[in-house]
């Protein structure tokens, strides 16, 4: 109701269900890119579960180490189990070997030829993954591939693979976090609905925008020129929770030419002043409540209302 019919028809929008979907959108040519991208608040923080991306991580990790013929064969044999694609019968050892010996940028054509991908599908591997491969520490994944994969099957292979898959997923999640930090994408605006969910430092949402300790790195730090937080319940938050939500604005891209006119340090100083003022207000409120509770009827009986006030 705030715009004329048809006035917004030029805007392209889409929904990114996962980090992979989002990064694929960044591969689009500028004139084809969407103006608005909708995601859930858990899109970037949830476990990284894309099978083809994980397989590509195996391929890129292999480039960082020398492997024996037996170790390579173990990868060809067990990779579908690691990425939980054993039901795709076309993903055979032969196909995995073919992928492991090909540039990940050429995987789309191979997967189409092997009937594992529709011809009109996007490339399964966003360009950003191989682009930053030399800035990523692959040692955790290399260790799993070199030391943890079974050399042969056994009666308890399912139990063994479950444990190995856990190690593998942890390594992939670490690589994903590095990938997200190193990627050079930026956005002019982030609109975060239900922003009060960022009130606790150790939630996945909060850690996207702010550090809970000196050792942490917020994954979306420096990605947005402007940030707009929406919440219908700001005054239901405790004042410390409100301060923590406000501190999430620290993730703004302060180095851009459209950065705020004041510095990050100045903003942090103002937030600290607000925190001190809210602390003082809370103490004063508690003191007033205590003193008010100590008033007794006999203390007022000999005074007129005007005199009492």
Give residue ranges: language-model regions.
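Conserved catalytic network of the ASCE P-loop NTPase/AAA+ motor domain
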Residues: 29-31, 182-184, 219-223
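Conserved nucleic-acid-binding Ia/Ib motif block in the N-terminal RecA-like helicase ATPase lobe
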Residues: 2-29
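SF2 helicase catalytic motif II
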Residues: 57-87, 185-217
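Residues immediately C-terminal
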Residues: 44, 197-200, 229, 236
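Coupling/switch/interface segments within P-loop NTPase motor domains and analogous charged loops
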Residues: 23-179, 308-309
């Amino acid at each position: 109701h705030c715009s004329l019919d048809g006035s917004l028809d030029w805007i392209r929008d889409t929904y990114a269900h996962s980090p992979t979907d989002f990064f694929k959108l960044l591969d689009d040519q500028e004139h084809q890119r969407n103006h608005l991208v909708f995601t859930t608040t858990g899109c970037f923080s949830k476990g990284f579960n894309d099978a083809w991306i994980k397989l590509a991580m195996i391929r890129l990790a292999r480039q960082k180490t020398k492997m024996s013929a037996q170790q390579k064969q173990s990868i060809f044999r067990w990779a579908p189990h690691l990425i939980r694609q054993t039901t795709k019968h076309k993903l055979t050892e032969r196909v995995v070997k073919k992928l492991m010996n090909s540039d990940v940028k050429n995987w789309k054509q191979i997967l189409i030829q092997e009937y594992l991908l529709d011809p009109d599908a996007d490339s399964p591997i966003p360009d950003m993954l191989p682009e930053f491969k030399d800035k990523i520490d692959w040692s955790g994944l290399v260790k799993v591939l070199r030391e943890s994969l079974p050399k042969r099957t056994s009666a308890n292979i399912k139990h063994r693979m479950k444990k190995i898959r856990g190690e593998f997923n942890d390594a992939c999640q670490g690589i994903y976090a590095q990938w997200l930090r190193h990627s050079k994408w930026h956005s002019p605006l982030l609109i975060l609905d239900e922003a009060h969910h960022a009130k606790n430092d150790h939630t996945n949402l909060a850690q996207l925008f702010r550090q809970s300790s000196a050792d942490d790195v917020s994954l979306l730090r420096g990605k947005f020129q402007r940030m707009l937080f929406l919440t219908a319940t700001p005054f239901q938050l405790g004042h410390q929770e409100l301060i923590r939500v406000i501190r999430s604005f620290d993730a703004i891209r302060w180095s851009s030419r459209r950065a705020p006119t004041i510095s990050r340090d100045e903003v942090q100083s103002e937030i600290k002043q607000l925190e001190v003022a809210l602390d003082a207000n809370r103490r004063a409120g508690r003191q007033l409540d205590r003193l008010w509770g100590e008033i007794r009827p006999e203390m007022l009986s000999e005074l007129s209302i005007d005199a009492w006030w």
